[in-house]
A protein has these predicted regions:
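Membrane-embedded and interfacial regions of multi-pass energy-transducing membrane proteins
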Residues: 2-6, 10-656
């Protein structure tokens, strides 16, 4: 059977041969003098020392360096030089520096083996796995801080930490988790699978992609460095005047946001350029996978909203170092300026986190329902609608902090309106599940949990959009529970679904199903037992970020804390499964274990560096499950093999 006469696009599809000008050499290692994570750490440390010395020298002529009387110039210079040293040590600056001095950049070396995961690499698949490691590092660190928080809240009178230490732990936990969550899907799964799903051989700008990863990791180190400097007491929102009054740890917070913001902008721009310009022939917008739609909407938010955060962080750094007064009220500034800048980014950021999770679920459930995705166009439109409306709701975070009362009804309305496109996305999932013969594999269980958790988080969000309710419960545990249900209950559960679904393709090794089931049920049960009581605690008046509370709330807090410890243990099951399945007792995965129609499953495993020997021509969308006579997903230009609508690969005569 041949499809060559039916191709919608006549394109040249020769076997892949790397151009001579872009040829790469292959070797297993790089030697101790080559650039890798070790040299990056050393260069970053030396850069920190040099920057601190230079900052002290520059600021020595200032009688008063900052509004707090501290030498924040030296702190900032140290962090800047640390990041530059880190990037230089990993090799991220080799190419631009060579071009800057007019020299030809050296050919890239394509490393094999484990060494490639600890170096600057231009393969989007390697970058995706590097992001996985980085995100898991964020998650582990933030999780340990969460355990410390719940340990303190076991007793309202017997304290593990001082009040000052407690608020700094809360602040560090919130900031690390928010920055991790901003990249938890778009970094690992977006970078890895978007080119595969659209039939591309690479990202539009591979160096920018790799650069965004190492900047992301540098931002993590900058934010985590706040703890040795005494932390910051502002919570993850960094509100002034606490921001301007805080110690040197605040510089780490502001510069960390600045650095991670640069990486987020680079990632968003690169993903958008790739999706718009690198789709395979025949992949019209109505054939783009729903996960790619979610990444495109997220990339638009990253590109448009993140510059506001970067500018806001820069203003705060100037206030801390050279005595400008953007947020210093007594010198003519306004603390409301930071709140507006922060939340103009901060609420789109909620959907930067949520939209990729919706995309993962929309991509997975048709596979295990063996049904086409219900109302595909509505799902895509819902994601675009959420992205657009997310820019018009940020003022609901200021209902109590000085917003003009006449503006409250407008932002209450826009906040309620955003539930409409979100509801469309939710109903698309319900329509797909309706009357389906569902296979309850581990990825599908996590997807079902996403709908359950996000329904609770979404309904509680509708209450919070109402001004009287918001004013009543603002600053309490009700808001905290709502937020964790939407972000952790939605995004992190979706990320786990994506890992269990796609890791067999990423590594060629299947995860242990029994451990996966243990992980799911413990995580799902103890997540709800941890955070649902917080709705009650919040309605009873317990404030956030305070290490003591009314004695009558101890039972609920103890119940929540014990559940949180068991929730943390569920992640240990995941890490054990990861180590067992991928390293200790690896089992080779079938080429397409879930019988998915997705284009990413139609290439070889392990995936070759160039992804596809021939660029496919897309014939239809990837959701024609259980449809008799459905067309093949794509023509791969190989007359001997046809990729069928069942997800299998057959020879031209129909034999398996």
């Amino acid at each position: 059977m041949t499809l060559s006469a039916e191709r919608p696009h006549e394109v040249e599809k020769e076997s892949f041969v790397p151009p001579a000008s872009n040829a790469v050499s292959r070797r297993r290692g790089g030697g101790w003098l080559s650039q890798h994570v070790g040299t990056a750490i050393v260069a970053g440390f030396l850069g920190y020392l040099l920057g601190h010395w230079l900052g002290n020298y520059i600021s020595s002529g200032y009688p008063v360096v900052t509004n707090t009387g501290q030498n924040s110039i030296a702190d900032l210079m140290a962090l800047i030089f640390m990041v530059v040293g880190w990037l230089a040590g990993i090799g991220a600056l080799n190419y631009p520096l060579a071009k800057l001095v007019g020299r030809e950049a050296k050919d890239d070396v394509e490393l094999t083996g484990w060494s490639k995961y600890f170096r600057f690499n231009l393969d989007h698949k390697v970058v995706g796995l590097q992001y996985v490691l980085g995100v898991l590092l964020f998650l582990f660190t933030g999780g340990l801080l969460a355990m410390a928080i719940r340990t303190e809240l076991l007793n309202p009178t017997t304290h593990v930490f001082s009040a000052d230490t407690y608020i700094k732990i809360v602040s560090e936990h919130g900031t690390i988790m928010m920055m991790m969550a901003s990249s938890v899907v778009i970094g690992p799964l977006g970078n890895y699978f978007v080119p595969l799903m659209i039939g591309a051989r690479r990202m539009a700008f591979p160096r920018i992609e790799a650069f965004s990863l190492w900047v992301f990791l540098a931002g993590y180190m900058v934010i985590f460095s706040a703890l040795p400097f005494g932390g910051f007491p502002t919570g993850w929102t960094g509100y002034a005047p606490l921001q301007t009054q805080a110690g040197p740890g605040m510089v780490s917070y502001l510069f960390g946001f600045f650095v991670i913001g640069l990486g987020m902008m680079a990632a968003g721009f690169n993903l958008a350029a790739t999706i718009i310009n690198y789709r395979a022939p025949g992949m019209t917008w109505s054939r783009v996978p729903v996960f790619v739609w979610s990444i495109l909407a997220t990339a638009a938010l990253l590109t448009l909203a993140t510059p506001v955060l970067v500018a806001g962080g820069l203003f705060g750094l100037l206030d801390k170092t050279v005595q400008t007064a953007f947020y210093v009220t007594e010198h003519g500034g306004s603390s409301y300026l930071w709140q507006n800048l922060f939340w103009f980014f901060g609420h789109p950021e909620v959907y930067i986190m949520a939209l990729p999770g919706f995309g993962i679920v929309g991509e997975i459930i048709p596979v295990f329902c063996r049904k086409p995705l219900f109302a595909y166009r509505i799902a895509a439109a819902g994601m675009i609608g959420v992205a657009l409306l997310s820019f018009f709701v940020w003022q609901h975070h200021l209902f109590q902090s000085g917003i003009d009362p006449d503006m409250r009804p407008l932002f209450m309305l826009t906040t309620e309106l955003i539930s409409i496109p979100t509801g469309f996305i939710f109903l698309v999932g319900m329509g797909t599940l309706y009357r389906a013969k569902i296979r309850f594999e581990v990825p599908m269980l996590f997807c079902m949990a996403v709908y359950f958790n996000f329904l609770i988080g979404g309904v509680s969000g509708v209450f919070l959009s109402d001004v009287p309710v918001n004013v009543t419960v603002h600053g309490g545990f009700f808001v905290l529970s709502h937020f964790h249900y939407t972000i952790m209950g939605g995004l992190i559960f979706a990320f786990m679904a994506g890992l269990y679904f796609w890791l067999p393709k990423m590594t060629g090794r299947v995860m242990n199903k029994r451990l996966g089931l243990w992980h799911f049920w413990t995580m799902f049960v103890f997540f709800n037992l941890t955070f649902f009581p917080m709705f009650i605690i919040g309605l009873l008046g317990q404030p956030r970020r305070v290490f003591t509370y009314a004695k009558n709330l101890q039972t609920l807090n103890d119940f929540s804390s014990i559940s949180a410890f068991l929730l943390g243990a569920s992640f240990l099951i995941f890490f054990a499964n990861l180590m067992w399945s991928q390293f200790i007792n690896p089992k080779k995965s079938p080429a397409n274990p879930w019988e998915s129609l997705g284009l990413e499953w139609q290439t070889a495993t392990p995936i070759p560096p160039h992804n596809f020997d021939r660029i496919p021509v897309i014939m239809t969308d990837p959701y024609h499950y259980s449809e008799a006579g459905a067309p093949a997903l794509a023509d791969f230009g190989d007359d001997d093999f046809v990729h069928t609508s069942s997800g299998s690969t057959t020879s031209g005569d129909g034999s398996a």
